[in-house]
């Protein structure tokens, strides 16, 4: 093996890292750890804004409104079923 570097020396140089790169990684890890987030699961409060108008306290009212609308729709369908439909040309 002539004038080149050995494969072991090349591998050693690849395995070494620059100390400034490690410092950057450590600062990111430290800031992530101090944010009290454990990943995507806890990211939801970060993306919700204060402009969000609905919350869990509004849910019973919204469900009640849906139930009322559904009841009215059912009553209208029952009325329609009780009355025979007349063809358009019979009334003339």
Curated annotation (Swiss-Prot):
Keyword Iron-sulfur: no
Alphabetic keyword roster: Phosphoprotein, Protein kinase inhibitor
Bias-annotated ranges (Basic and acidic residues): 70-82
Pfam families hit by this protein: PKI
Entry coiled-coil feature ranges: none
Site feature Important for inhibition, where: 37, 40-41
Region (Disordered), start-end ranges: 1-26, 70-92
Protein name per its UniProtKB record: cAMP-dependent protein kinase inhibitor beta
Name of the coding gene: Pkib
């Amino acid at each position: 093996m002539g004038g080149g570097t050995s494969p072991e020396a090349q591998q050693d140089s690849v395995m070494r890292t620059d100390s400034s790169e490690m410092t950057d990684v450590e600062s990111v890890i430290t800031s992530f750890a101090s944010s009290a987030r454990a990943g995507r699961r806890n990211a939801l409060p970060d993306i919700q804004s204060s402009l969000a108008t609905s919350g869990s306290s509004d849910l019973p009212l919204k469900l009640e409104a849906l139930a009322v609308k559904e009841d009215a729709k059912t009553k209208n369908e029952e009325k329609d079923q009780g009355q025979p439909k007349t063809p358009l040309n019979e009334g003339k």
